[in-house]
């Protein structure tokens, strides 16, 4: 069993305080929520230990009568977890949810050809285990969003774990090397792709060391897996198109939003309004 460092760092850039010192945490049954960076210790395949930061972003004042939903957010390749703080800070400040922002090893998520050789499913499992020590978290309302390589990680977690009720893979789709499994549990998916994306083309194909599925085919595979309606409702949003596969197992839903002039760097501050509205339904 990998050890989780009990030491928490104050997230200085946000000017917040961690009222629990490491010594106090060692003797307590649970930790109080506050904005901080925790450190997760993980062993690589070569038995080298690495220490990986995870930002926990909370409102300034915790309502102790409330159990907060949890949103994991995954950066793209070459990015870092700090990028999500500003994107989602209005939601975390207002207490809509608690933000959990892990850091990819070597600034990437290990889907095969990436620089990272870390077991990132294990890493997320370790984070979830650590979060069980905190008060006021609702593990029945846990969601994940990711962009680009982080989107691929979100898909992988949905395929291989049952942590999340809904996911939002942004600017990527399923890849051939990570097929859906018999053990994959029903989950709601909001997939968003830009038709003008040249980094991960909407039509799929070989790119960045992966073979990407066509974006529509990717959504259709989720829908088929969960026995959704195979005739999606098609909603025109100006020039953009939303495909809704409903009537899925366990009252789940698959949505695919095609943004016609969207490139790889989609406007997250705008998109997340719809993502959060989608998450809240599950």
What residues fall within each predicted segment?
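Alpha/beta-hydrolase active-site loop
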Residues: 114-135
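A domain-start/cap signature at the N-terminus of enzymes
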Residues: 17-70, 112, 116-119, 145-174, ...
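Hydrophobic h-region of N-terminal signal peptides that target proteins for export
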Residues: 9-17
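C-terminal catalytic histidine-bearing segment of alpha/beta-hydrolase fold enzymes
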Residues: 188-192, 223-282
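Active-site nucleophile loop of the alpha/beta-hydrolase fold
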Residues: 104, 168-176, 194-196
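Acidic catalytic loop of the alpha/beta-hydrolase fold
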Residues: 197-200, 264-266
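The conserved beta1-alpha1 loop
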Residues: 72-76, 193-194, 260
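Short substrate-entry loop that stabilizes the transition state in hydrolases
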Residues: 62-68, 73-108, 176-177, 199-201
